[in-house]
From Swiss-Prot:
Similarity comment: Belongs to the sodium:neurotransmitter symporter (SNF) (TC 2.A.22) family.
Major localization listed first in the record, in broad terms: membrane
Comp. bias (Basic and acidic residues): 44-55
Record's bilayer topology term: Multi-pass membrane protein
GO biological process, one term: amino acid import across plasma membrane
Subcellular location(s) of the protein: Membrane
UniProt keyword terms in alphabetical order: Amino-acid transport, Glycoprotein, Ion transport, Membrane, Sodium, Sodium transport, Symport, Transmembrane, Transmembrane helix, Transport
Annotated protein name in UniProt: Sodium-dependent nutrient amino acid transporter 1
Annotated organism of origin: Drosophila pseudoobscura pseudoobscura (Fruit fly)
Pfam families xrefs: SNF
Length: 653
């Protein structure tokens, strides 16, 4: 059967889907008896096609918009913000080997699988579960985790905008020590110390310090004392939102809404800038970072593997978590973006480009920030780079500003460029996450206007983000990231893979991929999807839950109420899976409870390509593949029979 071209045809009927799920070919339409009847049928077909065009899902303007959009979300805050401090917490170079192994055995397979599911069905994170209707809770749980991630990602945008605004000052405010800061070291070059505009008489001289005094850079003290006004204890509350950060948060959400208000028509055009501009600034910063004194020690710490850490399961767990966040798998954006593709778009190439570029960008960001950390350790006279600065959210807002302060020429210009780049990266990430939620709602409620849903969700995102711009906001961010983002995404990704590969079936899934992409699925993907990826994820998740410890922020434990709230957050996200499964069974009874349970694991009539004609061709293709396998199996049995008969006859002659 010729597959080329059938994917873009428009069908005349919406009733071919049921046959596809039952494995039977639809009966051929009766031929019209007269030319008049044929003309009437043609007219009817044209009307149906015209009606379908009105309700057809919007597509990307071109394939490059899709690729740029995937790059903008996968090459984002996860690379520049999260990857460096995750590597920092896990021994630098020791983290690279597990991360690269995890990328090939979990990251790439999951990324490609989600691209396939979105493009094949032209549906969002929830609607794709017509493949295994009982698993629809996976989609809703991932939506819950996505909302959690959106709320604190937007607070990072607020911090970025704050730094962007103050970068226009004649002297960068974090480059020098303020009078009230003791044991502080200027972030800008020491030869510029005499040029301070403010008195620094209270700043401790580095050479006069004893080994027992801990020095802090002015960039770190500025972030903690001026920007977030950090509370070291939230037992009495988290405080009120800071008005400056609140304003920055509002501006961030206005920009997000403007980008997504027209769906892929607007976000696709913005993707070119969102994907490409950050590389220009990151390369400039890299060139400067590697020329700083002490940068070599930091880069060596980042790249030199510590083989003993390979036996530490925690490092592997963190590698999986980072891979998920960096590639944005398990939370819906990849499925959502791919759902706006043409059915025959070449996603294999795009998946390989994005996952490879994502890794290279993570390495680029890692080298940049560890070069900066090496310089910071040199200036603070600290031998162990691990002890230079606290890891966590503040790393990007401490180490990067510290490096910018050391630029000899117009550091304000580079600061503006850098924080604008960081803002662009954040916009790219949140646009994808926010569009995922909007797509879920618009898929569910067809009559809702896309821009109205985008506006409503943006307002909700702003209101929920206010909690993170309080003095205790970083505590809440740590809590939500750990319980509402990391573990919820992890466990639901396991169910996602199990539902598609183990319940729907590897053979069925590979047939669908072959029909859509017109190429057979290689052994690498089959082995990863069916064995390596799910087994590794299950083992790492079980280990994580067995060895889980109370989380800390700035080396302090959360109050008991915080841990209870965290587990409640995790419970809400994870419970979506069983609760929606029970709901489906109770609302789709087919005989006994056991029969209803089995039915919930079979594809529904809605499963398959969205285009009716493409779906009809898919049904034919599936039936042909099933017939070929049956014939091959029968031939194999007959061959074995004649072989045994030959051996028997030969032994009796």
């Amino acid at each position: 059967m010729e597959l080329k071209g059938v994917h873009q045809q428009n069908g005349t009927s919406n009733g071919t889907g049921a046959a596809g799920t039952e494995g039977e070919s639809p009966p051929p339409a009766p031929a019209p008896a007269t030319a008049e009847a044929a003309a009437s049928l043609e007219t009817t077909t044209e009307k149906v096609d015209a009606e379908q065009q009105k309700t057809e899902r919007t597509n990307w303007g071109n394939g490059l918009e899709f690729l740029m959009s995937c790059i903008s979300v996968s090459v984002g805050l996860g690379n520049v913000w999260r990857f460096p401090f995750t590597a920092y917490e896990n021994g630098g170079g020791a983290f690279l080997i597990p991360y690269i192994i995890v990328l090939f055995l979990i990251g790439k397979p999951m990324y490609y699988l989600e691209m396939i599911m979105g493009q094949f069905t032209s549906q969002g994170t929830v609607k794709i579960w017509s493949v295994v209707p009982g698993f629809v809770g996976v989609g809703y749980g991932q939506a819950f985790a996505t909302i959690c991630i959106i709320t604190y990602y937007s607070s990072l945008l607020a911090l970025t905008l704050f730094y962007l605004f103050v970068s226009f000052q004649s002297v960068l405010p974090w480059s020098y020590c303020w009078e009230e800061w003791m044991n502080c070291v200027d972030s800008r070059p020491q030869e510029d110390t005499d040029a301070l505009l403010l008195s620094s008489s209270n700043v401790t001289n580095v050479t006069a310090l004893t080994d027992t005094v801990k020095l802090q850079s002015s960039s770190e003290l500025y972030f903690l004392n001026v920007v977030i006004k950090e509370k070291m204890d939230i037992s009495d509350g988290i405080g009120d939102p800071d008005w400056k950060l609140t304003l920055a948060l509002f501006v961030s959400w206005v920009v997000i809404f403007l980008v997504i208000m027209r769906g892929v028509k607007s976000s696709g055009k913005a993707a070119y800038f969102l994907a490409l501009f950050p590389y220009v600034v990151l390369f400039i910063l890299l060139v400067r970072a590697v020329t700083l004194e002490g940068a070599r020690d930091g880069i060596i710490f980042f790249l030199e593997p510590q083989w003993g850490e390979l036996l530490n399961p925690t490092v592997w767990k963190n590698a999986v978590v980072q891979c998920f966040f960096s590639l944005a798998v398990g939370s819906g954006p990849i499925i959502m973006f791919a759902s706006y593709n043409r059915f025959d778009h070449g996603i294999y190439r795009d998946a390989m480009i994005v996952t490879t570029l994502d890794t290279l960008t993570s390495l680029l960001g890692g080298i940049t920030i560890f070069a900066i950390l090496g310089n910071l350790a040199h200036n603070l006279q600290i031998e162990n780079i691990r002890d230079v600065v606290r890891s966590g959210t503040g790393l990007a807002f401490i180490s990067y500003p510290d490096a910018i302060s050391k630029f000899q020429a117009v550091p304000q210009l580079f600061s503006v460029l850098f924080f604008f780049m960081l803002f662009v990266l954040g916009i790219g990430s949140i646009v994808a996450l926010q569009s995922t939620i909007v797509t879920i709602l618009c898929d569910q409620f067809k009559s809702w206007k896309y821009w109205k849903v985008a506006l409503a969700t943006s307002i909700c995102g702003f209101l929920m983000g206010l909690v993170y711009v309080t003095p205790g906001g970083q505590w809440i961010l740590t809590l939500v990231d750990f319980y509402g983002g990391t573990y919820v995404v992890f466990i639901l990704a396991i169910f996602e893979l199990a539902g598609i590969v183990w319940i729907y079936g590897m053979q069925n899934f590979c047939d669908d991929v072959e029909f859509m992409c017109n190429r057979r699925v290689s052994l690498y993907w089959r082995v990863c999807w069916s064995f390596f990826t799910p087994v590794m994820m299950i083992v790492i998740f079980i280990y994580s839950m067995v060895t889980i410890e109370p989380i800390t922020y700035s080396e302090q434990f959360f109050p008991e109420a915080g841990n209870v709230a965290g587990w409640l957050l995790f419970g809400i996200g994870a419970a979506q899976f069983p609760l929606w499964w029970m709901w489906y069974i109770s609302h789709h009874r087919e005989g006994s409870l056991g029969q209803s349970f089995v039915a919930s694991l079979r594809p529904s009539d809605k499963w398959g390509p969205a285009n009716p004609e493409t779906k009809r061709q898919w049904v034919i293709f599936k039936n042909e593949k099933a017939a070929q396998r049956a014939t091959k199996k029968q031939s194999s049995k007959m061959g074995a029979f004649w072989q045994k008969l030959g051996h028997f006859c030969g032994s009796n002659t």
